[in-house]
Amino acid sequence: MSESTEITESSVEAAVEAALAAIAAAGDSEALKVVRHDHTAEGSPLAQLNAGIRSLPGDRKAAAGKLVGGARGRVSQALAAKEAGIAAAEEAAQLVAEAVDVTALPNRWTSGARHPLSLLQERIADVFVGMGWQVAEGPELESEWYNFDALNFDADHPARAMQDTFFVEPAEAHLVMRTHTSPVQLRALLGDELPVYRIASGRVFRTDEFDATHLPVFHQTEGIAVDKGLTMAHLRGTLDHFVETLFGEGARVRLRPNYFPFTEPSAELDLWHPTFAGGARWIEWGGCGMVNPNVLRSAGIDPEVYSGFAFGMGVERALMFRNDVKDMRDMAEGDVRFSQQFGMVV
């Protein structure tokens, strides 16, 4: 506040009148942002008046504070009202601009578009069907036994906690919304004759945030093969063929040791993406490994006779780096304009 400016009713009222006039003149949200900065931000007349209260004698501070505070409140209320009015006007203008006359006869039929996640899941399934695998399905509402116990999850494993898993009432039913598609693999081992080569895709549910890189409901693709004599070499060869078919020539995988309850040994699956939008690089994609003998025993299979490998990865994540999708929320919000850019092929 300058030394020549005093906190008087007239100086405060002048600052308020200037702010109100600017607010009234603002024609859109961008103009209102400028007004808000000029009349309420640090360095504005009202802000200078408010800062000047500190230099007043003690017997004047209360009255001056009440005067300036009331003025700032009037300006804030006017800004809020103007902001609401502009937002309503802009929304109304958008509705008019995007209005569709449902009685008008179209000149031609518009080509439809399927959701790219559905297309990508079918593309993945086609790759494995071409290798002689079969597609498997399973329920989204799953028992704890299939989702955790039979897959070698300890009773105190963090994934069983309510902050990670959606449990379904009543509690004594021991039902959960499946947290991965691995139960489909177990059901295939229990219900099909050996050898088993199955690929499964579907929705899974976790208590994740809804943001650019996380969804509480997303899709996974998992595969399992159980036969006599299978090794990590078979797993590696299968994954190399898969990624080269899906991502193009030059794509390959890298396996890094890790731990998963249902595989032993286990590995993180990295993908070398040769056509990544930001330049070729390694990208962490999923997990894999040899099926844990305890899982085979849960399905009544002798691990001394049979061995198997399994792998899993997120479909949304694959779509993001395969097709340069920046925000995972675009896949979940149902805006047809997102799907239309893909058409019928991904």
From Swiss-Prot:
Query: Which key words are in the record?
Result: Aminoacyl-tRNA synthetase, ATP-binding, Cytoplasm, Ligase, Magnesium, Metal-binding, Nucleotide-binding, Protein biosynthesis
Top-level division of the source organism's lineage: Bacteria
GO molecular function: any one? magnesium ion binding
The UniProt note on the cofactor reads as follows: Binds 2 magnesium ions per tetramer.
- Cofactor(s) the protein needs: Mg(2+)
Fetch the InterPro entries from UniProt: aa-tRNA-synth_II (IPR006195), aa-tRNA-synth_II/BPL/LPL (IPR045864), Phe-tRNA-synth_IIc_asu (IPR004529), Phe-tRNA_ligase_II_N (IPR004188), Phe_tRNA_ligase_alpha1_bac (IPR022911), Phenylalanyl-tRNA_Synthase (IPR002319), tRNA-bd_arm (IPR010978)
Q: Which GO terms describe its cellular component?
A: cytoplasm
Location in the cell reads:
Cytoplasm
Chief location category: cytoplasm
Sequence positions that bind Mg(2+)? E264
Its protein name is Phenylalanine--tRNA ligase alpha subunit
Origin organism is Leifsonia xyli subsp. xyli (strain CTCB07)
